[in-house]
């Protein structure tokens, strides 16, 4: 569906949404009393529209995509200045990505 065909109620930063780790969804209160929902897998697929299951309202979720590198290129990574650094220099597994970032497979 094109943006022109969608009636977007609001645009919400992903930092303002609540993540449910059990259901793997982000949600945000809807004016109807229910909540807008979007699955983490939908975000990874590039979807940015959260819907309310109880009414016709939709919101656009504003987020930054962070790509995960294929296994063959993970040991060496280049920064913006084209300077390589090692995967071991990155934050350890227990650390979360930056607020507003959604990790996706490249």
Curated annotation (Swiss-Prot):
Subcellular location: Cytoplasm; Nucleus
Pathway info: Protein modification; peptidyl-diphthamide biosynthesis
Transmembrane segments: none
Gene3D superfamilies attached to this UniProt entry: DPH Zinc finger
Boundaries of every DPH-type MB domain copy: 8-64
Catalytic activity reported: [3Fe-4S](1+)-[protein] + Fe(2+)-[Dph3] = [3Fe-4S](0)-[protein] + Fe(3+)-[Dph3]; 2 [3Fe-4S](0)-[protein] + 2 Fe(2+)-[Dph3] + NADH = 2 [4Fe-4S](1+)-[protein] + 2 [Dph3] + NAD(+) + H(+)
GO molecular function: ferrous iron binding; iron chaperone activity; oxidoreductase activity
PROSITE patterns: DPH_MB (PS51074)
Main localization (coarse): cytoplasm
Keyword Nucleus: yes
Domains: entry comment: The DPH-type metal-binding (MB) domain can also bind zinc. However, iron is the physiological binding partner as zinc binding impairs the protein electron donor function.
Recorded family membership: Belongs to the DPH3 family.
PANTHER family assigned: DIPHTHAMIDE BIOSYNTHESIS PROTEIN 3, DPH3 HOMOLOG-RELATED
Subunit structure: Component of the 2-(3-amino-3-carboxypropyl)histidine synthase complex composed of dph1, dph2, dph3 and a NADH-dependent reductase, predominantly cbr1.
Protein name: Diphthamide biosynthesis protein 3
Name of the gene: dph3
